[in-house]
Amino acid sequence: MNDELDTTLDLPGIELQHLLTDPDPTGTRPRRNLQPRNDPLESETLDDWLLTAALPAVENRAALVLEHLIQNTDRTVGARLAGEIARRYGDVGLPPGTIRVTLTGSAGQSFGAFCINGLHLTLIGEANDYVGKGMAGGEIVIRLPVNARYASNENFIAGNTLLYGATGGTFLAAGRVGERFAVRNCGGVAVVEGVGDHGCEYMTSGTIVVLGWTGRNFGAGMTGGVAFVYDRENKFDQRINPQLVRAERIANDADETRLRDLVRQHADATQSAWSRGLLEQ
């Protein structure tokens, strides 16, 4: 032990000799791990394929359309591509809709994480948790499967904690989403057809539209932004957390126009019969 180290008088019974002993007094052994990486034995991931396929378009700022199947073992799809766009162009990203990717199937966790300007992701199917986590721009759209015959507003299409920490971008989903939707949202825009408990928790800015059912404790810790909620059952006052937010009717033309534009955008992008029906009312 180094004799220069001070002694802590109130802990005289603690002996650190073995913890502080130099494991290699000769200095001949490596001080870092030199073993080969033990990566999983798996083929190229969907995210790898997406980055490779889109790289020339990113480099040349050229328009590109891609299609592929997706399954629930495909996690964080789009994150590497978003990272490459950010590395080259920073927060500005690419012009809107430069790279358009359509995926069909069930997406694994964190689909569209860190989405950025210029990246448009469309999922035909369903998604797990953390869709749009940390997204800063771009657009994520989730549509019903082609053969779906059920009512979108009565069924869940994505999991929990969507748009966690988003600072921008747009998220549109033809169905309900799970708990803690838009938690810590700070600038993202979203339209969904229902949310679970704790919606818009700790939200500081942005715009959220809920075209239907909401769970309990909505708006807990919410200090900014706007949420438009279709209170079909007239029970929203029982589900909102009144500590920091209040519920009120739309009282001006600007808010009404903004809401209608967002619902129309949702209907056009998701092909939702539910939002189309609301527009006709």
Locate the predicted segments by residue.
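Long, distal/terminal scaffolding or interaction modules
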Residues: 1-281
